[in-house]
């Protein structure tokens, strides 16, 4: 896709900036032609690149089989929606994956933990069907990633709210993992797990923790390994 000289320059730039960005790690992975998935969406929504999984799995054959099954599943999904535009394909994948397995699950878990009933009116099937019928070029506008939603609220909310930049919401996991929780997480991650020894490489886990401490990867990667090991110790 890219001329070799341009590819090298982009890779070098990404490498120089990569120390604290998983997104750039994935970009580097993509540019080097190491991603063979059904759609680039799955690369940027995944926690680990295939190369990283190779260092975490203790059984290369098992990893190969799992990657193959996942590729078949995702390719069938992409093929079933081949009539969609690029924008609508991303919307569909977000709705059927990240929103479904992460956002809605987290919303339900956290709201129920505090006795709250949460509703999601923007997921009404009639509204979703309407949105998929609208041409893609109307859904993206320079300087306004969600122009239809923004315009629909122009006369209902103060201007400073409608025009303000997107505000993310991220819990301070990194701060916790480098502070009060470090001892607990380090104990779990650096202790071999008999229940996972046939699947997970302890050396790979330790390297991932070291990368986090050196700010070469985000908190979400070692955190996911910590949760996996805690779950295995409790349930297997």
How would you name each of these model-derived features?
Residues 1-12:
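A mobile, often basic/glycine-rich helix-loop segment
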Residues 21-236:
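Adenosyl-5′-phosphate
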